[in-house]
UniProtKB/Swiss-Prot annotation:
It comes from Corynebacterium aurimucosum (strain ATCC 700975 / DSM 44827 / CIP 107346 / CN-1) (Corynebacterium nigricans). SUPFAM superfamilies: Ribosomal protein S16. Residues 129-144, 152-163 have a biased composition (Basic and acidic residues). Belongs to the bacterial ribosomal protein bS16 family. This is Small ribosomal subunit protein bS16. Keywords: Ribonucleoprotein, Ribosomal protein.
Length: 172
């Protein structure tokens, strides 16, 4: 029985994901597999390639023929060079940067929250109370200014009257 290592398409439309499978050469692309030995997700940046090296070496050793796309993947992971005994068995696989764990993100947010909020949370009641307090303060300030203006006016009139009295006394 001729055995091939090929890609089996999975995933949604325009979001292709593949399984690297070992199957009879006569089966269709999405047919029954003998063994699933890896995954390939070309839409990620960089592409995700995970192939079980031990199982790939076994199947290549017993005569399974890789298809052209799988051969390219095996060369990237270094499994083909290892099988053929060529230099460069480490491959040229690019690894994505590790995402920060959710626990680290949570701890960072918690530390930031412990520093205290930069502004107060404003609810409707607090907003109305604040507006009323501001309006009351503005009214009081206006009343104080008006009272101060009246007092200044009264003092000015008193000073004028005093000047007039002193001028009359000096004239006599």
């Amino acid at each position: 029985m001729a055995v091939k290592i090929k890609l089996q398409r999975m995933g949604k439309i325009r979001n292709a994901e593949y399984r690297v499978i070992v199957a009879d050469a006569r089966t269709r692309r999405s047919g029954k597999a003998i063994e699933n030995i890896g995954i390939y997700q070309p839409k990620q940046e960089p592409s995700l390639i995970q192939i079980d090296s031990e199982r790939a070496q076994y199947w290549l050793g017993v005569g399974a023929q890789p298809t052209e796309p799988v051969l390219a993947l095996l060369k990237v992971t270094g499994d083909w060079q290892k099988f053929k005994g060529l230099p460069g068995a480490e491959g040229t696989l690019k690894v994505a940067e590790e995402k920060p764990s959710k626990l680290d993100l949570f701890n960072a947010a918690l530390a930031e929250a412990n520093n205290g909020p930069t502004i107060e949370a404003i609810t409707e009641k607090k907003r109305k109370a604040k507006e009323e307090a501001e309006a009351k303060a503005a009214a009081e300030k206006a009343a104080e200014e008006a009272a101060a203006a009246e007092a200044a006016k009264a003092e000015e009139e008193a000073a004028k009257a005093e000047e007039a009295d002193s001028a009359e006394e000096s004239a006599e």
